[in-house]
């Protein structure tokens, strides 16, 4: 497995692959890898000849410097996992390689349709950071395919819009959420949970599934459903952040024309911000 840290070496390698008519899959990550990331890699491998995993803790995606400093850096362990998984290349650049100048003077990429709603309201500037680093990676790697998890549903919609708007010739694959046996969605941030918090964390998915079941049964009193879910989470010891039911295509409030809904939940448990979602076909 190649471990590359600089754009010139990366470009040289992917150019050679392209000349050999190899399809390339890109899996962007911030490291601290788990089985959810492995599912992305497997999805990429099923669709391409070469798999590139980027490992870069993007400072533009963090609201607070202390959160950036606390994010786990586990590159050696990550590379060991990726070698076992048969990844062809890890691109692990230093921050100064990706952002050689001060961030205040950095050129940014923005996707206003999805950047300033829901998660974007809670985390100002976060999606601008995502769009900027993903655009850089797309330009450097020139992938045929890129894989993203459905756990971060808004991010997936956001990336698809970015690809449309910027005319990238890249197939975006959404990979289903990987869960622990008790239903908790796998996340690098689950490592922030204490043993007791980890015991409580599956309540997020359990409350979500109860709400989804009601939607599938035809319940459409959205405010009532969300109020009940909020109360259940509070009783379970979680602090609800974002609980919404939206059109799965537009992420706007449901209308009479909505065919599919997505239920988006985020809640705090200790220092961890948990994220989960589920899609529902609406009964006409």
UniProtKB/Swiss-Prot annotation:
Stored Gene3D superfamilies: HUPs, Pantoate-beta-alanine ligase, C-terminal domain
Protein's UniProt keywords contain NAD: no
Pfam families: Pantoate_ligase (PF02569)
Domain of life: Bacteria
Keywords: ATP-binding, Cytoplasm, Ligase, Nucleotide-binding, Pantothenate biosynthesis
Subcellular location: Cytoplasm
Active-site feature positions: 37
Pathway of action: Cofactor biosynthesis; (R)-pantothenate biosynthesis; (R)-pantothenate from (R)-pantoate and beta-alanine: step 1/1
Subunit details: Homodimer.
Described function: Catalyzes the condensation of pantoate with beta-alanine in an ATP-dependent reaction via a pantoyl-adenylate intermediate.
Protein name in the entry: Pantothenate synthetase
UniProt organism field: Sodalis glossinidius (strain morsitans)
Organism classification: Bacteria, Pseudomonadati, Pseudomonadota, Gammaproteobacteria, Enterobacterales
